[in-house]
UniProtKB/Swiss-Prot annotation:
GO MF terms, alphabetically ordered: structural constituent of ribosome
Domain of life: Bacteria
Name by which UniProt lists this protein: Large ribosomal subunit protein bL33
HAMAP family attached to this UniProt entry: Ribosomal_bL33 (MF_00294)
Cellular component terms per the entry's GO annotation: cytoplasm; ribonucleoprotein complex; ribosome
Coiled coil start-end: none
Annotated Pfam families: Ribosomal_L33
Family matches, as InterPro entries: Ribosomal_bL33 (IPR001705), Ribosomal_bL33_CS (IPR018264), Ribosomal_bL33_sf (IPR038584), Ribosomal_zn-bd (IPR011332)
The family this protein is said to belong to: Belongs to the bacterial ribosomal protein bL33 family.
Name of the coding gene: rpmG
Disulfide pairings: none
Originating species: Synechococcus sp. (strain WH7803)
Keywords: Ribonucleoprotein, Ribosomal protein
GO BP terms in the entry: translation
Length: 64
């Protein structure tokens, strides 16, 4: 029997400040992986997480 596709999916969160920074201080882009419930959270996920490149808490948005 085939298994159904689960409701929970793995998404990647990327730092918005590292991605849009124009200065060369940032050596990379901070990324986190997490799971979200497809039925309860249909829009893109936005969480405040620690960015080691900026050394502060920043907003991380879901990417494709």
């Amino acid at each position: 029997m085939a298994k159904n596709k689960g409701v929970r999916i793995v998404v990647t969160l990327e730092c918005t400040e590292c991605r849009s920074s124009t200065e060369k201080r940032s050596q990379g882009v901070s990324r986190y992986t997490t799971e979200k419930n497809r039925r309860n959270t249909t829009e893109r996920l936005e969480l405040k997480k620690f960015c080691p490149h900026d050394n502060k808490m920043t907003i991380h948005k879901e990417i494709k």
